[in-house]
């Protein structure tokens, strides 16, 4: 168990170094000057001397590898630098936006499970029947639709035409989270529904299900007492991947709905060339994704006693 933990920790650290180094390379090679964006406005032209002094204050005059090494050392102590656009520490700016993203992703996850699990099970139990074809077509459409396009359609129908929900929300509200959460849930839920269908179909063909049916056990009991307990592990694995996608993929949806979250913050940071904020966002996504994978891996041990004995 200790060796496995050490191995996972090593992979965690190496992955973080790789992701942050790549992000640093991209921001370093990106066209444009963040200092010029920071200082100049439409009515003001800043002297080259002021630009050079500001660049030196921010440490942007140093070689690339020195900048990266300084950032890694500071990040290890919880200091991700100052946001150019927000004029405050990156950590503080991200903590302001974090609740919005967590609420949106959490609500979308609930909608995803409520939609995908019943639809996937229903599709599997009615394989090659009309309801199966309808659900599979709907899931194909859901997977194929870009989130920004679906979001705009939902805004037009439920916001502009019907007036049931706000078109956009700059604050976190119960009504404001509905449309962006539904937008995410349709796309993510369609992916998950197809995986649920495949997992349930695979379990339905196994000997223990055939034997239970031969003994006259009801379909409901077979589903809830046999199929679903055995399908939990693969379904949790797939769900863990989708949760990671939710946390990292909310940026477009947050922008469309003006939702105050990390994704919206990151897109604004990109337009303003706010490199410390961009790097902080990428670090957050990487850590969140790897932590979710670690939790999924740990859940295996809790749900499957055989794995616990193997790793003891």
Task: Cite the ranges covered by each PLM segment.
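Membrane-water interface segments at the C-terminal ends of transmembrane alpha-helices
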Residues: 23-29, 58-59, 73, 137-166, ...
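Hydrophobic alpha-helical transmembrane segments of membrane transport/permease proteins
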Residues: 16-69, 162-179
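An internal, D/E-rich "acidic patch" concept
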Residues: 60-117
